[in-house]
């Protein structure tokens, strides 16, 4: 055997190769980062939910709206319901974030590496189509796991003893919610609106990490910022805006389908879109966009910034 052939037969050694998190570590790291982010952004989720349900299927006079702007809604809820009102559904939001973002952030890289290996014979490949498919696939997993929790969270956040909008449920806690839903509709009741949740989550997941990675590459290519927190924050902000624009319509549809009782208003997501446009106009699908952006942009910034740190922590434990 020649020297050249001998060299080819030897396994390649790259001392600078970056170690990757496994699925379990990635799931835990992504979920922990998401929980930290949702603690800071949950009040805007409450506001967004109430905006999306306000004036449902009616031509509501703007002067009669309870919630008029993000700032006014924040002040109104804080004044009459306190911090408890602003943080409604927070415990359920934690469980949901572990399921959704744990899958979305934790399984994105393993799925992407697998698809790259299948189609490009290179686990480190960087094709936009594969990145989008990986985001959509990880988001789909998260949506299926997390739909029952988002259902309960939405119903908790829409509840207000002072200024109610939409259907009011008054769940005491997540176990009370599950018990009542199963008693009334069976286990299938926990997955009401899951089709809308999948559309929403897949649309957001398919662009979140690809836009984040693209923004980081552009920053590096043009040498705009040095490696560090500011670079991650900037890339996260760009990603958050892209996610908000992509998923807003599906987010409104999902909120309304989760809030309704026994499909009294909408049969499916398409039916919801058509009825909303006919009754309220096209831009009703963008109700709560300001609150959504106020939530999703900081949430994406905090989540993707935190995950950089939690990944380092878990890689350290994995190495040890």
Swiss-Prot record:
Q: Which reaction does it catalyse?
A: a dicarboxylate(in) + sulfate(out) = a dicarboxylate(out) + sulfate(in); (2S)-2-isopropylmalate(in) + sulfate(out) = (2S)-2-isopropylmalate(out) + sulfate(in); (2R,3S)-3-isopropylmalate(in) + sulfate(out) = (2R,3S)-3-isopropylmalate(out) + sulfate(in); malonate(in) + sulfate(out) = malonate(out) + sulfate(in)
Q: What does this protein do?
A: Antiporter that exchanges dicarboxylates and sulfur oxoanions across the inner membrane of mitochondria. Exports alpha-isopropylmalate from mitochondrial matrix to the cytosol, where it serves as a precursor for leucine biosynthesis.
Alphabetized, the UniProt keywords read: Membrane, Mitochondrion, Mitochondrion inner membrane, Repeat, Transmembrane, Transmembrane helix, Transport
A single GO cellular-component term on record = mitochondrial inner membrane
Instruction: Return the similarity comment.
Output: Belongs to the mitochondrial carrier (TC 2.A.29) family.
Q: What is the recorded name of this protein?
A: Mitochondrial oxaloacetate transport protein
Membrane spanning residue stretches: 26-47, 91-111, 129-145, 197-217, 233-253, 285-306
Residue windows of the Solcar repeats: 21-114, 126-218, 227-313
| Subcellular localization, as worded in the UniProt entry | Mitochondrion inner membrane
Q: Which GO terms describe its biological process?
A: mitochondrial isopropylmalate transmembrane transport; mitochondrial oxaloacetate transmembrane transport; mitochondrial sulfate transmembrane transport; monoatomic anion transport
Q: Name one Pfam family in it.
A: Mito_carr
InterPro entries per UniProt: Mito_Carrier_Antiporter (IPR051508), Mitochondrial_sb/sol_carrier (IPR018108), Mt_carrier_dom_sf (IPR023395)
As for membrane topology, the entry says:
Multi-pass membrane protein
Q: Which domain of life is it from?
A: Eukaryota
Organism the protein comes from: Schizosaccharomyces pombe (strain 972 / ATCC 24843) (Fission yeast)
Provide a Gene Ontology MF annotation, just one. Answer: thiosulfate transmembrane transporter activity
| Sections of the chain in a coiled coil | none
């Amino acid at each position: 055997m020649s020297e050249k052939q001998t060299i080819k037969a030897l396994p390649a050694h790259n001392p600078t190769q970056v170690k990757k998190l496994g699925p379990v570590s990635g799931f835990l790291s992504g979920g922990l980062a998401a929980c930290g982010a949702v603690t800071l952004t949950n009040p805007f989720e409450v506001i967004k939910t109430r905006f999306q349900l306000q004036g449902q299927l009616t031509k509501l006079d703007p002067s009669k709206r309870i919630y008029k702007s993000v700032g006014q809604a924040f002040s109104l809820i804080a004044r009459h319901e306190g911090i408890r009102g602003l943080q409604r559904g927070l415990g359920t939001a934690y469980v949901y974030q572990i399921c959704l973002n744990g899958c979305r952030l934790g399984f994105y890289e393993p799925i992407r590496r697998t698809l790259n290996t299948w189609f490009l014979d290179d686990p480190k490949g960087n094709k936009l189509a594969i990145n989008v498919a990986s985001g959509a696939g990880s988001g789909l997993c998260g949506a299926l796991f997390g739909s029952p929790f988002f259902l309960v969270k939405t119903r908790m956040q829409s509840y207000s003893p002072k200024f109610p909008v939409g259907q009011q449920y008054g769940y005491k806690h997540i176990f009370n919610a599950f018990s009542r839903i199963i008693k009334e509709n069976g286990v299938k009741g926990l997955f009401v609106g899951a089709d809308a949740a999948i559309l929403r989550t897949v649309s957001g997941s398919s662009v979140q990490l690809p836009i984040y990675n693209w923004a980081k590459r552009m920053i590096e290519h043009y040498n705009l910022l040095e490696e560090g927190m500011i670079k991650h924050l900037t890339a996260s902000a760009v990603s958050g805006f892209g996610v908000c624009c992509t998923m807003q319509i599906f987010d409104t549809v999902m909120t309304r389908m989760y809030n309704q009782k026994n499909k009294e208003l909408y049969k499916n997501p398409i039916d919801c879109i058509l009825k909303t446009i006919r009754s309220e106009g096209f831009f009703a699908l963008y109700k709560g966009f300001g609150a959504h952006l106020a939530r999703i942009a900081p949430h994406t910034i905090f989540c993707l910034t935190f995950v950089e740190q939690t990944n380092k922590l878990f890689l350290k434990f994995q190495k040890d």
